[in-house]
């Protein structure tokens, strides 16, 4: 029974951190401000997380688990190359839109001035997603008997850059310009261009 309140407090701390990232764009989150938001002392924060970097790592773990588990579901459920790519990009954009504070972590904006390993971890997550996109595009030849005229690594990079750009616009607009705005039309255009290559 003693473990449950600790888990709930940890989750509450992370939720407050994400909320502060959303409501205080451009501002650095200090442990003093976070403790005040959570309603505990700084010492109480450190009982649950040994450092602020560990708090951000908790958010990054949530991001990784959420995105990578859903990407695995897409891979299991969908076999069409273009549909897989569409669903993966849509997943990234919807996730960012539903979690504005966390989109600042995805974008790297919230990690400025923080431990380098946090930025490396986000970079690693995007590298995994890009690798998955590249693999999907390469499998098109095997699955559908026809590949692309452009290298799949270049195409995967283009697709991910599109999603990252939409997330960056969302953060830069202080969450007013939704990442999913016009996605369907944009995807139709992107897909048409990819299939022409």
Swiss-Prot record:
GO terms for cellular component: bacterial nucleoid; cytoplasm. It comes from the Bacteria. Belongs to the nucleoid occlusion factor SlmA family. Residues 7-67 form the HTH tetR-type domain. Residues 30-49 bind DNA. The lineage of its organism: Bacteria, Pseudomonadati, Pseudomonadota, Gammaproteobacteria, Alteromonadales. Its main location: cytoplasm. Residues 110-130 form a coiled coil. The gene is slmA. InterPro entries: Homeodomain-like_sf, HTH-type_Tx_Regulator, HTH_TetR, NO_SlmA, SlmA-like_C. This is Nucleoid occlusion factor SlmA. GO terms for biological process: cell division; negative regulation of division septum assembly. It is found in: Cytoplasm, Nucleoid. Homodimer. Interacts with FtsZ.
């Amino acid at each position: 029974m003693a473990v449950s309140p600790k888990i709930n407090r940890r989750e509450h701390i992370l939720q407050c951190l994400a909320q502060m990232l959303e409501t205080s764009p451009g501002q650095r989150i200090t442990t003093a401000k976070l403790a005040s938001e959570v309603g505990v002392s700084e010492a109480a924060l450190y009982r649950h997380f040994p450092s602020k970097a560990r708090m951000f790592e908790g958010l990054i773990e949530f991001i990784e688990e959420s995105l990578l588990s859903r990407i695995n579901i897409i891979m299991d459920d969908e076999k069409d190359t273009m549909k897989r790519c569409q669903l993966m990009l849509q997943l990234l954009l919807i996730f960012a839109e539903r979690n504005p504070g966390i989109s600042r972590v995805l974008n790297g904006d919230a990690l400025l001035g923080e431990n380098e390993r946090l930025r490396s971890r986000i970079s690693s997550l995007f590298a995994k997603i890009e690798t998955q996109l590249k693999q999907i595009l390469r499998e098109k030849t095997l699955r559908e008997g026809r590949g692309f005229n452009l290298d799949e690594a270049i195409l995967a990079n283009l697709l991910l850059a599109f999603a990252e750009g939409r997330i960056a616009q969302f953060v830069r607009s202080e969450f007013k310009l939704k990442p999913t705005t016009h996605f369907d039309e944009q995807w139709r255009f992107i897909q048409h261009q990819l299939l022409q290559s």
